[in-house]
Amino acid sequence: MDCRLTARLGGVPCEVRRESSGERQRFRGAAGTGWSRGGGKEDWRPGGEFFMSLEEPIQKRAEEFRRRYAAVREQIGRVIVGHEEVVHGVLTCLFVGGHCLLEGVPGLGKTLLVRTLAQTLDLAFNRIQFTPDLMPADILGTNMVMETPEGRRRFEFQAGPVFTQICLADEINRATPKTQSALLETMQEGTVTVAGTKHELKKPFFVMATQNPIEQEGTYPLPEAQVDRFFFKLLVGYSDREELAAILDRTTAGLIPEARKVMDGPEILQWQRLVREVILAPHVRDYVVRLTLATHPKGPFALPITNQFLRWGSSPRGAQALALAGKVQALLEGRYNVSFEDVRRVFLPALRHRVILNFEAQAEGIEADQVLLDILEKVPEKADALPAAAALAEG
């Protein structure tokens, strides 16, 4: 059974019809324009009024996702005061199967947020305190020589604290780069290899790392390969006057509220699959591609500010993060397709850790967010506006 749902496709009112025969999707407009995919061919002709048809179960699942997301936010809000954007970013990472890097000075509630999240989602939780003397085996585990009842000796793998579902890597940049890199395989593959034997981690597996600002003493910058594996980098700021007063009321009155379980692992995996079913139309996909390419200095889509202040641009993981996070945002806005605004909203947390500033930017005190905001402002939504945008950028 099909039902009809009015939505917006990349900022345009639209409706999508999924035809079971031939795996065909079609976007149709009143003027006969639109985009269709079938038989390995794609055709996009913008213009006209679009109408979309969604299968009823898909629409119901999207509405249920919004309701369940709100339930998780409510429980976290019982413990965590403020930091609305940070909580939203953390949950976005969770529902796409990504990992999250939180940056902020000590004492802002980063660890409490992770612990509350694990309690709300009924997931196994381990905390690893990163220190300069921490070794990779302390994280991953190691083979131990064990003696059997018969008196024989054999190697037995003793799992490390990373064998959990929510792993808090606390103050990750206080450990040496060798130890930091121990998480590379676990974050990308969801496995741990010790002495040639691969061990699977239970799903969902979510790494949330916290780090202090890199200018503080006793910190080591994360390797670029590891930073790129974090889906989002979120900046945790200070609480304002009202939030700080609420924190005092909650933590000094003797009764600290607790979050209760409202979701579990299998349900999270279900929502992760739903997110990937959200439609990314070709013109929105092209916008994601052009935004990512605009961060590449000396590239064909590079802007003047890119060439001036960036040494390296975003990897393809940045484009993947924009698309997937945009899909979560679309579901939360009641749509089953990604719009330009969805992409813009997640642009900074998805790319701020994936661009590397050059010496000139560092000398002038330019931050990555400043460069990215300028790119976001100058890259047009529609590809046919590129010549005008290029002329404006040069001027």
Task: Give the ranges of each region predicted by the language model.
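Walker A/P-loop
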Residues: L94-T131
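Pre-Walker A (pre-P-loop) alpha-helix and adjacent loop at the N terminus of AAA/AAA+ ATPase modules
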Residues: E63-C100, V105
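Conserved alpha-helical scaffold flanking the Walker A/P-loop in AAA+ ATPase domains
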Residues: L91, M146-L168
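C-terminal engagement/docking regions of AAA+ P-loop ATPases
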Residues: M52-E56, E63, K298-G395
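Walker B catalytic acidic pair
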Residues: D170-E171, A182
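Conserved C-terminal "switch" segment of AAA+ ATPases
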Residues: I58-F65, Y69, V79, T219, ...
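Canonical AAA+ ATPase core
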Residues: M146-E150, A175-T179, M187-V278, K327-Q329
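AAA+/P-loop NTPase substrate/partner-engagement loops
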Residues: T120-T148
